[in-house]
């Protein structure tokens, strides 16, 4: 299990844009399971939508991408782990995105990502987001690890 303190050592994101709270399962170069607790206190709900708060789909996809970044960094060889602070993950593409169910304050988003392809510093991931075991969003993500 990886808590938010450890996640912040891996990812450069910070509040309000750090979108994963904990990693519950990780098999390097294979898959990751992480979650985010969605709360009404998040600034995004001031405008999306007043009186009818819905967590934006782009934020769900970004949360998937952040979980994928943790997976990619934790899959680096031991000798490269010390160099994580000098690296960052960039999005290359988002494909096949589908939003199947709205996400509201009080929901716990569970991100499940599997590696479809990995070559060098490029990763292709199948990402899915669930609430209480029900699929709410999915996308295929491509990202690249680069020097800062």
Swiss-Prot record:
InterPro entries: FabA_FabZ, FabZ, HotDog_dom_sf. It is an enzyme of class 4 (lyase). One of its GO terms (molecular function) is (3R)-hydroxyacyl-[acyl-carrier-protein] dehydratase activity. CDD domains: FabZ. It catalyses: a (3R)-hydroxyacyl-[ACP] = a (2E)-enoyl-[ACP] + H2O. The active site is at residue 48. One of its GO terms (cellular component) is membrane. It is found in: Cytoplasm. One of its GO terms (biological process) is fatty acid biosynthetic process. Belongs to the thioester dehydratase family. FabZ subfamily. Involved in unsaturated fatty acids biosynthesis. Catalyzes the dehydration of short chain beta-hydroxyacyl-ACPs and long chain saturated and unsaturated beta-hydroxyacyl-ACPs. This is 3-hydroxyacyl-[acyl-carrier-protein] dehydratase FabZ.
